[in-house]
From Swiss-Prot:
Belongs to the acetylglutamate kinase family. ArgB subfamily. This is Acetylglutamate kinase. It catalyses: N-acetyl-L-glutamate + ATP = N-acetyl-L-glutamyl 5-phosphate + ADP. InterPro entries: AceGlu_kinase-like_sf, AcgluKinase_fam, ArgB, Asp/Glu/Uridylate_kinase, Glu/AcGlu_kinase, NAGK-C. PANTHER family: N-ACETYLGLUTAMATE SYNTHASE (PTHR23342), N-ACETYLGLUTAMATE SYNTHASE, MITOCHONDRIAL (PTHR23342:SF0). Pfam families: AA_kinase. Disulfide bonds: none annotated. Its main location: cytoplasm. It comes from Thermotoga sp. (strain RQ2). Signal peptide: none annotated.
């Protein structure tokens, strides 16, 4: 047992050295938010990353909690082509749940476990300037990222804080916009030239049949979309990953957030447990 523990630490050591002082943007969502054990493990992982000298930044989702709050208030959620139709009343609920509830719960748990977390949203310091998303027709106050102003994030991480970001952006029209958390995380990672973007999902990574693909280049990832290997909800995640890598992010990891300590297992081990997308070295 003791030798096993030593071996785990020795395996992690070169990665701890390599990533010391580097910025990781982590999208927290899916199973990791719904399962209590996974939620607790996520908090522990973030604290451990921080204590090994990594600078973690969290971007979180919260779709199921938004739908539940709407139902509790007697409002039936409406979806169009898989996207939430967000009228003014729905946007108020989105902001209330993401910014006022989920964000503060994550911040509280990080701080209770020895972190120094600060909760913000994309409206703070105009972190995320948004514009209306029209690709899927008019679905209300659903936005896409027009610009990221990362100065507030630099200020927080340079002063040893862990930023926790709710993906609600501000439009130049003064409206709040609900932004997909994967997209927000990718754009923030690009603005910071982050070492890594980690997307927590409900599956083990990119699959070919039932087999996990451990590593991909952006070109290979795009080919898997074209040939139909990557389908459904994994398509936008892979597209986010490709965009991030081509935008200067060192690597993107798509991993199963329902697996306890998934982040540590992916980052600090040779084999990893998910899919890593990065450019070929050299």
């Amino acid at each position: 047992m003791r030798i096993d523990t030593v071996n785990v630490l020795l395996e992690a050591l070169p990665y701890i050295k390599e990533f010391y002082g580097k910025t990781f943007v982590i999208k927290f969502g899916g199973s990791a938010m719904k399962q209590e054990n996974a939620k607790k493990a996520f908090i522990q992982d973030i604290i451990l990353l921080k204590y090994t000298g990594i600078k973690p930044i969290i971007v979180h989702g919260g779709g199921p909690a938004i739908s539940q709050m709407m139902k509790d208030l007697g409002i039936e959620p409406v979806f169009k082509n898989g996207h939430r139709v967000t009228d003014e009343k729905t946007m108020e609920i989105v902001e209330m749940v993401l910014v006022g509830k989920i964000n503060k719960e994550i911040v509280m748990n990080l701080n209770l476990h020895g972190g120094r977390a600060v909760g913000i949203c994309g409206k703070d310091s105009k972190l995320i300037v948004a514009e209306k998303e029209t690709k899927h027709g008019d679905i209300g106050y659903v936005g896409k990222v027009k610009k990221v102003n990362p100065e507030i994030l630099h200020a927080l991480i340079e002063n040893d804080y862990i930023p926790v970001i709710a993906p609600v952006g501000i439009g130049e029209d003064g409206h709040s916009y609900n932004i997909n958390a994967d997209t927000a995380a990718a754009e923030i990672a690009k603005s910071l030239m982050a070492e890594k973007l980690i997307l927590l999902t409900d599956v083990d990574g990119v699959l070919k049949g039932d087999k996990l693909i451990s590593t991909l280049t952006p070109d290979e990832a795009e080919e898997l979309i074209r040939d139909g290997t990557v389908t459904g909800g994994m398509i936008p995640k892979v597209e986010c990953a490709v965009s991030a890598v081509r935008g200067g992010v060192g690597a993107v990891h798509i991993i199963n957030g329902g697996l306890e300590h998934a982040i540590l297992l992916e980052i600090f081990s040779r084999k990893g447990i998910g899919t890593m997308i990065k450019e070929l070295e050299g």
